[in-house]
Amino acid sequence: STCTIRTGSPAAPRYVAELLYIPPAWVSEHASLIDATSPSGTGERDYALLHITKSVDDAPLPAKFTALPLYDGQLTKNAIRGEVIAAGYPAVYAAGDTDTNLRTRSATTSVSELFTFGKQDVDVLALRGSSMGQQGSSGGPVVNADGYVIGMIATRGNDAADGPGSLRAITIDHINRTITEETNASLNQHLSGDITSRAQIFATTMTPFLTNLLTEEIEQ
């Protein structure tokens, strides 16, 4: 199968990508949900890295892609009540046509609470309700006042506590810690150096195993 990345507003096909990394532990735990129409989860290890290999029209790739900087430090309680911007492509606004009418949106909100999957590390941000709290926002960045991406939208939040459209986002620190734990290489290391070779190694060593897990669930 082909992974096509869309960019712009409205979103249009621009690039072809391959899988660079996905946490095997997450795939193993959630393989049974592959056919679920409305799967849910906590966001723990719920991320993937993609490697852009070419343009859809075979035009030369840019020497460097424009990107927001990642905040790779540990968040503290000072992040609570901090103003942030959440952005993405909430499909609810696409008027039923996500192929041609998917547009970027963003909203200013704030962090209401911090959560951990362990004992003390900040793994999840609770975001107060906003227009971004819609289906399709997952994967969008959460950007702090300094312009750094501190998290990635993962799940719906608790509307009773944080208002309609609340969200939960896993922190960049969570992604960095878990990918380092699983591979002995940090997030920044995965995003630099010989990415093509790293993607090929994952494809030959892990992809067959993960594909088999999913295939077994589908065929049950």
Language-model segments: which ranges?
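Extracytoplasmic
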Residues: S1-T2, T42-Y47, A79-R81, S106-T108, ...
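Active-site substrate-binding loop(s) of clan PA
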Residues: E29-G41, T53-N101
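Structural recognition of the beta-strand scaffold that forms the well-ordered cores
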Residues: A48-L50, I85-A86, G151
